Amino acid sequence: MKLTFLGANHEVTGSCTLLEAAGQRYLIDCGMEQGKDTYENQPIPVAPGEIDGVLATHAHIDHTGLLPLLARNEFRGRIYATNPTVELCGIMLRDSAHIQEFEAEWKNRKGKRSGAEPVEPMYTVQDAEAAIKLFRGVDYNTKLELAPGLVIEFVDVGHLLGSASIAIWVTENGTTTKLVFSGDIGNQNQPLIKDPTYLTDADYVVMESTYGDRLHGPRPDYIGELARILQRTFDRGGNVVIPSFAVGRTQELLYFIREIKEKGLVKGHGNFPVYIDSPLAIEATRIFRDTDPDCFDEATRALLAQGIDPIQCPGLRVSVTSDESRMINADREPKVILSASGMCEAGRIRHHLKHNLWRPECTILFVGYQAVGTLGRTLIEGATDVKLFGEAIEVRAEICQLTGLSGHADKNGLLAWINAFSPKPKRVFIVHGDDEVENIFAQTLTDEGFTACAPYNGAQWVIGAEGAVCVQEGTRVRVEHRPSEGASRAATVFQRLVSAGKRLLRVIEHNEGGANKDLARFADQINALCDKWDR
């Protein structure tokens, strides 16, 4: 059997691995690269028509976003995923295709004036529909034979509704080898969904490492913090605008807001309106409601047993059409607006920012990771003005973050997951982490007695009776990056701050061996500065 690592190696998006075993070829995930890209993904080394199938760990676009392109290029195999993942991919791949078509149309309108050659979308809605027809839903904890000598099982990994680790049994020459692909390992105690299931045996493991170098810290009081933000904003007469990822995070926030209203934690504002202004989020919320209750955690199942919808609350309103979206800003009552995209790079959220950023009574609340170079990152780094739809907008609203919300396990969560295997796997392949994070986490596992490595894109490993042997090293072709257009002054200022911090570290190193009295005074001055600015 052979593993070829094609994407999300020494980076966190574009997950794709080719498994060739028992006479079959299967991709595990086929994701789109998003945000900052470090290394070029490698092309799939076989024609799409020669691939027998795909196993999708979950619905996020960085794990499934190239499935329509695969279908466009004559892939006709089955795509296996859990039933909730099949449902979520149905809406997310269509949405991704609409974005591809819109961006191509916009570039062509712009390019026509300059005589540029027309561009084609990466894929179309028709391609997405073709891919969606290839999906087959699989129940959790149910073994399925894909072909003689190839058996799979999906196990809940607690990252997103429908997310899974995938166990694969390969039988060749009378010997059975078990592989486990972790998928994205979930954080503990997330609302709605179950905690990750720990598997206990495998010969080889392919494991994510997103937060393999850090800890999340103590779990914040999300409901209390959110209630305080709502209270002070509504008391000022303002709106709370929340850029939110349509699938997963929006439903978590609805869960929190339902509890806030149920307990009366916001005083004096009755059943304040809560708008979901994202067609994708509205569809995702419907899928959450229609999903088998067994997919949810114990607390959510208890609510459902009492006839309580865990993501429904009085005052909840949905805006499907563009006209309905525009009408939200005509409503002067203090309200919550949940809209996509979560990093403010596209979608209806940009219109809500235009109408609310300049108002000091309003709050913009970020509830997820903001990648470098995005409008969301620019705002949380302290921009005083931004440009939206060609218009300069002064930032006068309160900018807040609800920290600690994460769908990914931290370092301790990852270690708990891998340490559940007994005996230890023969080798652990580290994927889905930033460049240095993968190296750090591989070393952490090595220090704990595992045999671990972090392959680069294009690496090939042959697994047989003699063990796992690397037959081709991955390539380290770095992607050239251009600075994003319209970057805010705040990004430049923040880089000055980062440079100053690096200089401080160099000065500290230069003082090694100095007099204790001087070093103590230096440390006191640094701590005083940190105390002043640590907010």
Task: State what each model feature region is.
Residues 52, 203, 335, 362, ...:
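Conserved acidic residues
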Residues 185, 218-223, 314-324, 343-345, ...:
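A general structural motif
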